[in-house]
């Protein structure tokens, strides 16, 4: 008689996705980040739910309700620190996951990749509206500056901004709707993640060699389930260490000051994980151009599969393309640094050069170098 997990309508789905799933035998720890992102999402939803029980989305009490959570609620300080730093870990795993996809050519699973880019945008939107909720100085001014960018949309820009604000400035209506969005989006992300997984299991995982692995598959459980558990343990260790020892390391000190519409902070900047995109936005003097560059800095990922010119899938055996990949990594780090710097010389020109290089790498240099590598691989013509 067949096992219940193989016959039960619901357990059968779980079995095919997490137990009897055939997986390539040679996938490295770079394939752990998908499950780590799932863990991050679970942590964020769980801690967020407990925070929502005590938080009030009203401009008169929002800031003090966060202080109340940290001071008066049992382990409220821990829940808040885990949630705030959990967001940072979410983005660390996300960037490493995307980097893995770019390095090993996982983007050639087009449906999986495109759903992944949509997931990335959803996570960014969720993090942005979440950052507004404590109603500190950086929350208020960050919301004002970023939502104001929509006024660059031709014809309907101003109406669009006022529609999102729910008035003529960032006010109580804005905070209330941002809280509603922040509560809703994680569940949308969870649903999109299931679709992401569904598309992945249509084709199966890629592997470091970038070749077809059908001849050498092993079951997901116990091999990769235990491997994932090790990843969980290491990430939870890192997250709890950060939340317990230096919880405010990645935050902005300005957000400990209650929001004041009459006083502008000296440097308005988003959380560290948005700085690379913020630097690209600031590097273009034109408002609409900056908004388009900001949007395209993420959407350029959707173009990557179309511009894949190599005969090989990954970068494992392509040293020139590897060099460009690590140039891209360095470029994103430079943009992250520039995004946190004031708008003055020499940071302006560094940001502009780094922004141009960012798009050049994706749209011109990588496809061109891949094409040249193809030429180098061709068998030389034998002279008679």
UniProtKB/Swiss-Prot annotation:
Heme b b562 binds at residues 83, 182. It is found in: Mitochondrion inner membrane. The keyword Transcription regulation does not apply. GO terms for cellular component: mitochondrial inner membrane; respiratory chain complex III. The chain crosses the membrane at residues 33-53, 77-98, 113-133, 178-198, 226-246, 288-308, 320-340, 347-367. Pfam families: Cytochrom_B_C, Cytochrome_B. Belongs to the cytochrome b family. GO terms for molecular function: metal ion binding; ubiquinol-cytochrome-c reductase activity. It comes from the Eukaryota. This is Cytochrome b. It is a multi-pass membrane protein. The cytochrome bc1 complex contains 3 respiratory subunits (MT-CYB, CYC1 and UQCRFS1), 2 core proteins (UQCRC1 and UQCRC2) and probably 6 low-molecular weight proteins. Component of the ubiquinol-cytochrome c reductase complex (complex III or cytochrome b-c1 complex) that is part of the mitochondrial respiratory chain. The b-c1 complex mediates electron transfer from ubiquinol to cytochrome c. Contributes to the generation of a proton gradient across the mitochondrial membrane that is then used for ATP synthesis. Heme b b566 binds at residues 97, 196. The keyword Heme applies. InterPro entries: Cyt_b/b6_C, Cyt_b/b6_C_sf, Cyt_b/b6_N, Cytb/b6-like_sf, Cytochrome_b, Cytochrome_b_C_euk/bac, Cytochrome_b_N_euk/bac, Di-haem_cyt_TM. GO terms for biological process: mitochondrial electron transport, ubiquinol to cytochrome c. It comes from Anoplogaster cornuta.
């Amino acid at each position: 008689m067949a096992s219940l997990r193989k016959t039960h309508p619901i357990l059968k789905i779980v079995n095919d996705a997490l137990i009897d799933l055939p997986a390539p035998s040679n996938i490295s720890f770079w394939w752990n980040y998908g499950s780590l992102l799932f863990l991050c999402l679970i942590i964020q939803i769980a801690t967020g739910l407990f925070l929502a029980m005590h938080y009030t989305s009203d401009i008169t009490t929002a800031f003090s309700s966060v202080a109340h959570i940290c001071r008066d609620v049992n382990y409220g300080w821990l829940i808040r620190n885990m949630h705030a730093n959990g967001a940072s870990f979410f983005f660390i795993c996300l960037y490493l996951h995307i980097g893995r996809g770019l390095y090993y050519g996982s983007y050639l699973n087009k449906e999986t990749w495109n759903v992944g880019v949509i997931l990335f945008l959803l996570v960014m939107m969720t993090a942005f509206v979440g950052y507004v909720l404590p109603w500190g100085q950086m929350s208020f001014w960050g919301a004002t500056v970023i939502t104001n960018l929509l006024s660059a949309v031709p014809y309907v820009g101003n109406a669009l901004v006022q529609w999102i604000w729910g008035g003529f400035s960032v006010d109580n209506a804005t905070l209330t709707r941002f809280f509603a969005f922040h509560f809703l989006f994680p569940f949308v992300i969870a649903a999109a993640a299931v679709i992401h997984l569904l598309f992945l299991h249509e084709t199966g995982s890629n592997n470091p060699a970038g070749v077809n692995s059908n001849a050498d598959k092993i079951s997901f459980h116990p091999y990769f389930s235990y491997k994932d558990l090790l990843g969980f343990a290491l990430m939870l260790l890192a997250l709890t260490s950060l939340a317990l020892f230096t919880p405010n390391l990645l935050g902005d000190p300005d957000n400990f000051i209650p929001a004041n519409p009459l006083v502008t902070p000296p440097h308005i900047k988003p959380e560290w994980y948005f700085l690379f995109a913020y630097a690209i936005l600031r590097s273009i003097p034109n408002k609409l151009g900056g908004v388009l560059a900001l949007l395209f800095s993420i959407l350029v990922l959707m173009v990557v599969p179309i511009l894949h010119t190599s005969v090989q899938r990954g970068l494992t055996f392509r040293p020139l393309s590897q060099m460009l990949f690590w140039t891209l990594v360095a470029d994103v780090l430079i943009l992250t640094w520039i995004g946190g710097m004031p708008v003055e010389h020499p940071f302006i020109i560094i940001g502009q050069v780094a922004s141009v290089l960012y798009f050049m790498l994706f749209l011109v240099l990588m496809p061109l170098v891949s094409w040249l590598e193809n030429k180098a691989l061709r068998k030389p013509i034998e002279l008679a």
